[in-house]
Amino acid sequence: GLDFIKSKEFLKEDYEKVLEVLSSFQNPPRILSEGSKIEIFKEVGPPKEFVDQFKFHDFEGTHGIGHTRMATESAVTTMGAHPFSTGSDQCLVHNGSLSNHNSVRRKLIQDGVQFETNNDSEVAACYLTQKMSSGLTLRSALTESLDDLDGFFTFVVATSKGFGVLRDRIACKPAVLAETKEYVAFGSEYRA
């Protein structure tokens, strides 16, 4: 079964203690996100069931990101599902494939980053988290990623203040944006 701790104040004040307690379980639960503005929900299955299961139609907020995935770099599991959150109040979804994710992963591990999956999208999320933790803005971190990440990709990265979209320089994966008075919508496939 799943047990959830839904006290943001507890998680913020006693984060290390929570991690220690969680690691003592035989099958430890995972923290999917931290922070006070963004909540992450992951599941494998049909999107309609996922929306109904978590009652997304009852949510309020300034922005939301959903992702339907065709796995190319890792297994189809709940932990491998998008979005990936590797920093406080930020998350990433990704369409494409990073060809240098293993070398970037090794460098991040040398810098002390810990990974939960073998997913190339998690590597991108950790890369951006590290860049923003060093003081870069989301825009600057995304711009630097064009020099450091190889492959074909489109990223959508959300923070508590908004979101950014980035395509690789070759632009193999679509980035379709629609803007009305009520919303801005994005898709990384034309039929979306």
Enumerate the language-model features and the residues they cover.
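Conserved short alpha-helical segments that host acidic/polar catalytic motifs at enzyme active sites
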Residues: 1-192
